[in-house]
Structures are given as structure tokens and as C-alpha cells.
Amino acid sequence: MTHELSSTPQIDLLNDILKNSVESNVFSDYQKKQIVTLILKSKISTAIVLLSPKSTAASEWNYLCNLQDLHECVLCVDTILPANLQTIAKRIFSLVLLPPLNDWCKQLRDAFLRFVSQPSICPTDFPLKLFFLSTVGIELLIVNEKIIPQKTQKYLLYELFSSPSSITANEIARLCQEANNRNYLLQSLTSATDARRAFLNNPNYRLLSAIIFQDGPSNLAFVLAKDCVLLARQPETIPVSFERMSSLLLMCLPSHPDFISPEFCHEWTELAERNGLQEEWLNILNTACNFKECRAIIHKECSEFIKDNHTSRVAILISMKLAFQYQLSQVIPTLKLLLQSKVYDSVLLEALRQSSTLGPVKQLIADDSCLLNNLSKLLLDTNISPLDASSIATIIYNMCKFKITKSEHERELNQLRNMAEASKTIDYKEDETAPTERRIQKILEYDILSKLFSAAKHYNSLNGLLAMILVHMANYKLARRKLVQIGALKFLTRQCFIQTQDSNAAFALAKILISVAPHSIFTKAFPSNRAIHPMSKLLSTNSADTEYPILLGKFEVLLALTNLASHDEESRQAIVQECWRELDELIIETNPLIQRATTELINNLSLSPYCLIKFIGDKDSDFENTRLHIVLALSDTEDTPTRLAACGILVQITSVDEGCKKILSLQNDFNYIVRMLTDQDEGIQHRGLVCICNIVYSKDQEIFNKFIKTPKAVETLRTYITKQAALKELQHEALVMIDSRLQGSK
């Protein structure tokens, strides 16, 4: 049997709404009319007058202003709306009724601001409450806070956070993406007790707190934690106090560790036992156990409670954390209690994150194929929480971390830092190089790292930790090719690392690129300059805030750039443009390995005209003269690899007439070139012969004449003896050219 409804403008309007709704095709005509009836019973007709604000009666607006939440217009305070009809009703509100409300608020925006700026205003006056629950009103309240009197602000904030509407929460979240708006809310909530209590009780607290506290802990967290203590003394708000306390302590305990006191522990243990909130109290204690000062209090005051709840996984986790400080030998047995249940949840991940700093635990994880397989599976879950993803990344970092050999200066700094922190370190055999390399191999076998790369696309907080992981993994030479295959290079060249100039990401890049053929990696779609730019920044850094020693890092960057410089002209050009200022300084570095690596890099770069111009540019430039002086000096240094590289640079410089003339402008002869023939190293002799061929084949007669006049130049060339056929051929070519030109000049 169908029920006919009299046609009215409101009914026609609602029918039109249903007709245009995307969900409407699933309802029969009767169901649509039933929806209309229920909505009318909920006095939705009063809300529809928003479509024509000029005809709104004061009594209707007063009714709307007294609604606790705008959603009550469609959720039927008088009649319970059936669950199968709630979706369409909410859609009617959010898509059809809310926009007219916002339009109405926009029209009267200036009038409202003038009205609300009066010091004598009563915040409950019609129709302020409704206005400030609209998206436009929320924006005006937060963005124009200086216009609104403080008393009114506090009231409106209370009303704002008292609203259970997700629309209200989402609008606050949107506005709080701006730092100024977040600061306003932080300051306002800190001084507004009622608004804070409403904030704590808001059903959208998790969303709102994540947005408001996104810049890190603030004094507000400490104030809210104290509010929770007071709220817990009221029976109706005990559950919400326990629910909120754990996350608040995480933010306020670093600066207020004394919040966990014997009195607090006694009071909340009693509350938990009386109200059946033991698990919630254990979660709070677990958070507090992350702080050394708090562990002492908890160990003394709550040990009995923890023992009484020993079947709880959180209680086992707390026991493990306390064992770290009071009975280290019990850490692994306690961890095994969690592992034996084969439950791979957040509790286990936190336990592994905490304990995997210990060598035996690292090996325990590596030997448990079931555990590694489940860690890999957890990362496939698109709904994995940021904390769980971070825990897995931390576990992997601990497992693949090598013991780093730092420079003497860096060791002294670390020693002083450790003394200041009174930290204790234990050397485990599992931390030696061979076991660490085997663990890295296991991690790669289970494909955990590539899944972490995918997770990092959703959680930016993983990026820094993954860069640190890759620094250590790339230290294992046999893993480098596999790292390239799973996308490590593309991950390390993400824009986020370039913007933050992440040193660890650049170090990892360098380590991988030292021993991988560039042509097998870089393409037009993925050019080498993507890697060159971040590595170039490391050459000038002196920051100690890295996973690796600075000097070693710079050395490896130079080696990686040397490899890239052999790739193509575009790479050489990019390196010259990005790194030359640093190379000018590093080539005179007192550390012989750094100087050698720099010279070898410039040798490869000298194939490019962009590099050569740095030596043979302007005639009277001090910069070019100084660089050439340094290279000439290095061609006679004691370190053979450095000599070889410097002589290689001279080969390229002498390949052009301007380069030969530049040498003559500094030395007036080619003595440095001739001297290469007397070196004991055949590689240097080879370079010397090529230089001589470049000179004697020059069409510039002045260059040729200067060589002939160089003391003992021709004599040294004629008397040069070698068993190498290639060198004999070069010697012969040079002598033939000399004799030919001398004969022609007669």
C-alpha cells in the first residue's frame, strides 16, 4: 500500500533532491516518499528555509540556533531514521542544505563580523551559534580571531569543539594546515578550560589532535594531560580520560617527566581496577616506559599491577622495557613470550623495535623466517598505520646497521656525548661485519625493503629512516646491484631528499654508484644529473649529523662522481656546473685520499670542454693560473695514483693550443711534461709521451719551438727506453714529427 503526500514546495524540493541524488536509483518510489516523510518529521523544513534566507522567521532561526549539531536536521531527533536511509539523508544535508547555509553566511559575513566585534555581545544571541558552526563561520572565527572579543572566542571555541559533526572537524583540519591558524588554536585552547574539555570529549579528537599537534609537542599537551587527571575524577569522563592520556604523555613527558609520580600511579591504578580499564592503563604505562625517569617510578609503584595482568601482551611489552634497565638478561626470554603466540601486531612490532638494538635479538629475527615473512606481509596492507610502518623500518635499520669506524675527531665528540648522556654500550659478536652482511642478504630475500619504499609514498616520515638503512645496506658491496634493481636509486633521488638536502640519502647514492656501471642505470627518462645534484651538496658539508664519517662520505662521493664522469658528456657538464667550487678546495685537501680522489675526478672531467675552460680560460685569470699550478705540482707528487691523474689532466690540457700556451705562460718551457718520461711508472710515461705528441703536432710554431728549447727535451725523448710496444710507437711518432719539422725549417 502506498501513501500519497500532498504536494508542497518543500515536498517537491525534496523529491527533486532525491531524483538528482546518485544513490536514488536504489530506492523505490514508496521508499523515497518515506524518506520525505521522515525528513519532514525531523523538521527539515525549518532548515530548508535557508534556501531563501530573506524569508526566515526569527522563531525558525532560534530553533536552528539551538540545535546542538546541524546534522540533527537530517538525523531526526524526534524520530530515529532507519539505518538504510541515513546515507541518503546525510547526502541531502551535505550536498544540498549545507551549501545554501554557507552562501547565506557569505552574504552576511561583514555584518556578522561587525556584530561579533562588539564587546557587549552575548555569544548565544541569535543566530551566532549556527553561523559559527558553518564552514564559513569556522573560517572567520579562526582566521579573524583578533576581531572577536576573547570572551566570545572562548565560548565559540567551546561550541566548535562540542560539535560531533565530522564536517566541523574536517573544516578545522583544513584551516589548521596553515601554521598561523594552528598557533591560534594552540594558544586559545591553552587558556580556555571549557573549550579544552570539549576538545578532549570530541568524537573527532584523533583527527583534530593530529592536525593541531603536527608541529610537535607543545605546552597544550601538558595542560590537556592535567585536564585528563581532573576529568578522571568524574565518573562519566573516566573512559575518555584514559583513552586520551597515552598520546598526550608521548608529547609532554620529554619536557615534563615528573608528570608520572607515585601519587599519579596509585590514583590511576585504582581507577583502572575499579572501572575495568586495566588494558587502557597498561597502554598508558607502556607509553611512559619509553622515558628513563618514568621507568624508575613505574618499576617501583606498578610492578604488582603489571604482574597481576601478565597475560596481557602490553604487560609483557612493559616488562621487556623495564628489563632493559633493570635485568638485561630477561629481555630475550620476555620477547620470546610475545613471539611464541604468532600474533604479529603493533605490540610485537614495538617490542622488536625496542629490542633489535641488541645483537642477539638481531640474529633471532634474522633466523625466524616466519617472522620475516609476516613483516613483509604487513607492509602489503594498505591500511598499515604510520607507527607500525615506522616500527618495521626501525627494526630493519637496527638489523643492517654496521659498526662505523669514525675519524679520531669524530670519536672524541661521540665519547664526550656518550659521557654526557651516561649511556652504556655493549659490543656483540652479532654486530660484526659478516653477520650484518648475512642479515642484509636475508632482508633483501624477503623483499621487505621494496615494500618500505612503497609505504614511504604514503608516509613521508619513513624517508629519513630509509635513507639511513640504505647507507648501511650499500656498504655491503654484493647488495648494491640488488638495491638498484628494487629501485633504491629512484627512491634516493626523490624530491623530498633534494629539498631537505638529506646527507644520508646522498651518502647512500654515492656508495651504490661507486661500483655500478652508469650506462646500466641512467636513461633519458632518468638522467644522471638526478643523482649528481644531491651528491654535490655533500662535498661542502661539515655536518656530523649523518650515519657515516664526513671525510669517508666525501671520499665516496668523489669516487661515485668519477664513475659518472666516465658515462657521457652531459654527466661531465653537470658535475662541473654543480661541484666545481668544492673541487677547487678539495684538490688542496690535506687528507691524501681526498686529494687523490678529487684529482682522479678532474682527470675524467677534463674530457669535457666545460672542465678545460677552468684551466685555460682568461689569459690573466688568477683562478685558472692557480688551478694549473696545482695540477703541475701534483704531477710530481709522491702518491702515484695522484700523479697519474694529474698527468692525465695535462694530457687533455696539451691537446689544445690554448692549453700549451697556458703552461708556457706559467713555466716558459715544458719541463714538467718532459719529466714524466723519467718517472718509474709506465702509466705516467705513457701520459708524458701523449703530451709530447700533442705539443709537437701543434700547428703553432711557437709551441713547437718552446718544446725544442726546453732543456734536454729532445735528448730525453730520444734516449727513452721501454719494452711496451704502444709506448715505442708514441716515441717513434713524436721523433719523426720533430725531425720532419726541424728539417722543414732549414
Swiss-Prot record:
Stretches assigned to coiled coil: none
This protein's UniProt keywords: Cell cycle, Cell division, Cytoplasm
Record InterPro entries: ARM-like, ARM-type_fold
UniProt keyword Endoplasmic reticulum present: no
Record carries keyword Cytoplasm: yes
Gene3D superfamilies according to UniProt: Leucine-rich Repeat Variant
Subcellular location: Cytoplasm
GO cellular component: cytoplasm; mitotic actomyosin contractile ring
One GO term (biological process): actin-myosin filament sliding
Primary site of residence: cytoplasm
MF GO annotations: Hsp90 protein binding; myosin binding; protein folding chaperone; ribosome binding
Function: Essential for actinomyosin ring assembly during cytokinesis. Has a role, in conjunction with F-actin, in assembling myosin II-containing proteins, such as myo2, at the division site.
Protein name listed in UniProt: Ring assembly protein 3
The organism's taxonomic lineage, starting at the top: Eukaryota, Fungi, Dikarya, Ascomycota, Taphrinomycotina
